Curated annotation (Swiss-Prot):
Gene for this chain: yjbE
InterPro entries to which the protein is assigned, alphabetical: YjbE
Leader sequence segment: 1-21
Region (Disordered): 59-80
Protein known as: Uncharacterized protein YjbE
Keywords: Signal
Record bears the keyword Signal: yes
GO biological process: single-species biofilm formation
Low complexity: bias regions: 68-80
Length: 80
């Protein structure tokens, strides 16, 4: 149970910190506002960070070692 709580906490903490970005002031140059991530890719970075956090949480709770976590994944492919 403790591992599950730590996993949930890790996901929540990483999702909260990665999804926030400071707004750019009106008239401010884009180059001066840029840090390590450009504005256009911030949502993709948030998704990958959260996905990484989910993977870490699954590993911490034993979900990544072949044990049954009770989840089901369904993939649907459509061709046109």
């Amino acid at each position: 149970m403790k591992k599950v709580l730590y996993g949930i906490f890790a996901i929540s903490a990483l999702a909260a910190t990665s999804a926030w970005a400071a707004p750019v002031q009106v008239g401010e140059a884009a180059g001066s506002a840029a840090t390590s991530v450009s504005a256009g890719s911030s949502s993709a970075t948030s998704v990958s960070t959260v996905s990484s956090a989910v993977g870490v949480a699954l590993a911490a709770t034993g979900g990544g070692d072949g044990s049954n976590t009770g989840t089901t994944t369904t993939t649907t492919t459509s061709t046109q």
